[in-house]
Curated annotation (Swiss-Prot):
Membrane topology term: Single-pass membrane protein
Name of this protein: Assembly factor CBP4
Disulfide bonds: none
Organism whose genome encodes this protein: Coccidioides immitis (strain RS) (Valley fever fungus)
Cellular compartments per GO CC: mitochondrial inner membrane
Amino acid sequence: MGSAWKWTKMITVGAVVCVGGPMFVNYVRPTEEELFQRFNPELQKRNLANRDKRQQEFDEFVTKLKEYSKSDKPIWVVAKEAEELQKKQQREAALAAKKAAAETPTDKPTQ
């Protein structure tokens, strides 16, 4: 009889913890709107002003991840390769701009 009581007690406690824990977390955790309302007005304005930019950056990030996932390589390897390629292109563009600036004659009036 003692063994059955222990099993029943442990199963009951386990169920309460497994079900009650997440329910308690959901009850205590504020919603996104409640958090936004707690911001001071200046932060609310700044958040609203930057919302479109952040959403666009997130969409670009997800698009890049989708492109990277098409490769057979792990995503972090493909992302690093893409980052290195982008840096190389930026260096080449900067070098080309430097050369173009050096080749362009500057017309300075002589006095």
